[in-house]
């Protein structure tokens, strides 16, 4: 009879052997993130299916991917129209669109969720995915603010669940945070890292901590700039100039907040504050709340900390 240690080792080997090479990727959510992930996956010669309940969102995503590819092709083959067309077609031919989750995940080797940051909606989606997908399918989330342990709470097999946090715009941003929670298997994690490298990203590993690496450092930095301004210690303009010229940042914290979206910044910080109310760095900003309540969400709305034409 096998000892418990041997049994665990055999199970680990079995799990590793069962996981298949990633060829078929299903991305759920046809927004900017989902579209970008689809583009880089198809560009890496993977078979891609993009799923969204909204047909018009799928059509918009398809057109957006095509336009993005045309820009890439024009830059790569500036004087060769035929090569440009061939590049665009070769990538688009590997992307399918669908409104049916169950049908789209049944042959997937990897599922990437890129939908709204609502934990109840995500849990409902993952319940459907786990039932319809193969037992070896890797199931991941692109969440930027929610804990994997909370999202995957009801999954029966948590060993094949992990996080793939891409950055917007996906085709241009080189980083991919590969996130593992306490039950993510080594085999799953290693395959997610391999996938990241396949799609041309530099991967960094992180445990299931709020905001992972980038947002955990970046969002509190932006909020500390807000507190500096709210206390009257310096103007927004001077804070932005100081961080650009003194720290070498490409954008100051207020410019960056407007670029990210003030509603997005507020959503992330509100979620962290609810989970960790004693953490001073996660304290909400009255000014930010007021701007968001007024519909001033940054560049996308025409006004945030600054006004945009």
From Swiss-Prot:
Keyword Oxidoreductase: yes
Subcellular location: Mitochondrion matrix
E.C. number(s) listed in UniProt: 1.1.1.35
A GO biological process held by the record: fatty acid beta-oxidation
The protein's annotated pathway: Lipid metabolism; fatty acid beta-oxidation
Keyword Thylakoid: no
Class of this enzyme: oxidoreductase
UniProt xrefs under InterPro entries: 3-OHacyl-CoA_DH (IPR022694), 3-OHacyl-CoA_DH_CS (IPR006180), 3-OHacyl-CoA_DH_NAD-bd (IPR006176), 3HC_DH_C (IPR006108), 6-PGluconate_DH-like_C_sf (IPR008927), 6PGD_dom2 (IPR013328), Mito_3-hydroxyacyl-CoA_DH (IPR052242), NAD(P)-bd_dom_sf (IPR036291)
Gene3D superfamilies in UniProt: N-(1-d-carboxylethyl)-l-norvaline Dehydrogenase, domain 2, NAD(P)-binding Rossmann-like Domain
Annotated site location: Important for catalytic activity: 165
Oligomer and partners: Homodimer.
Homology family: Belongs to the 3-hydroxyacyl-CoA dehydrogenase family.
PANTHER family in the record: HYDROXYACYL-COENZYME A DEHYDROGENASE, MITOCHONDRIAL, PTHR43561
This protein's name: Probable 3-hydroxyacyl-CoA dehydrogenase B0272.3
